[in-house]
């Protein structure tokens, strides 16, 4: 693995953490949304990551012995919560049913805030790794001068 592929790994990590943060911010913004264009309350979303595989001719020949070469991380899918919404008794609410109950998203904003902090820290870790690789490349170029 060369230094430039390390930059690619860090860049993919930054991109994945950015996507995770965007989904978490969407969850927080819609924590009290009772009506969506699809009907019903907002459904919480989660990001699922997967390893990117680096396929090279050498790796394809010796993949059995060496194992797959990981080239970063990617967003495999964004899953939507399938649990039943939380029902609250608010009889005067415009979205209340005949019994006076309103369906709200089943989510915990504090949990999403903690996850958002984790995404931010993951992004920062990838930036630090990218800066370290950049420094290594610059030092290697200095040696050649």
Report each predicted region and the residues it spans.
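Amphipathic alpha-helical polymerization modules
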Residues: 1-145
